[in-house]
Amino acid sequence: DLDNYKQIYSALAQYVAEMNRSIVTVTGVSSGVDWFNNVNESKNQSSGVIIAQNGKQLLILTDYSPVKQADDIIVTFNKGIQAHASLKEKDETTGLAVIAVELDVLNEDFLKNDITIATLGSSNIRDIAGLPVVALGRPMGINGSLGYGIITSSASESAASDTTYRILQTNIVGSQNAGGVLFNLQGQVIGIITNGKSATDMKNMVCAYGITDLKRHIEKMSNGEKFAYLGLKGVDVTEEANSELGVPYGAYITEVEMDSPAMLAGIQQGDV
């Protein structure tokens, strides 16, 4: 009945308030001078999620694009508290970055009572289709927006340089400029929202990189480590391709990026 319906959404609202303690707004501030020597300031925003605390810094996973050319990075926490941040490391393949806020600029009571470090769950679970999720950050293209829904598919992958990423598709109608994270109902991040990875006829449906495929990258960025780069895109050779076409098992190279180490080493499209 209607009372049960209200109770469900009341419980969801309470859950969202708890999860939002780990969600922040990231603002990249850039300055320039126009033709008349007037200083112009531009701001680009995204959402971020607090992923770790290393004893000196609070680490935040966010989109790389707003901070790429930024002269200053400002993080707005829950309750409107702001602090400056620095770029720890970026991953241009996924368009993600880790930024750091120094702990000594934040009040101890605030750190203890008002923010939460997000728990990274697993996206490689059986029967993930149908799993209820909450999208937080900016799923509607606006910071602070949210959406409720389910995972509808995890069958597609996004090929990137030297790796592939599992894509979680949802039934949440969002923005083509969506960002943020997907939480399951156990308080765990299971996906990082990305735009441009949905099927052509589902452009406004929120989708996300599965968190399991990103964990190694997140760890390296959190430690300020660079990524090894070959410049290859490929797919696994299927049993059908092996039996019907005689293609040996392995990684079938679908693309070699121009001037990449792989290209300079003589690796070509079609190699296995």
PLM regions: where:
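Short, small/polar residue-rich loop motifs at catalytic or cofactor-binding pockets
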Residues: 43-45, 69, 174-178, 260
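Active-site substrate-binding loop(s) of clan PA
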Residues: 50, 86-88, 106-142, 173-174, ...
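C-terminal cap/linker of serine protease catalytic domains
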Residues: 11, 15, 185, 189-246
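Active-site region of chymotrypsin-like
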Residues: 103-119, 147-207, 247-255
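PDZ/PDZ-like groove recognition
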Residues: 40, 45, 220-272
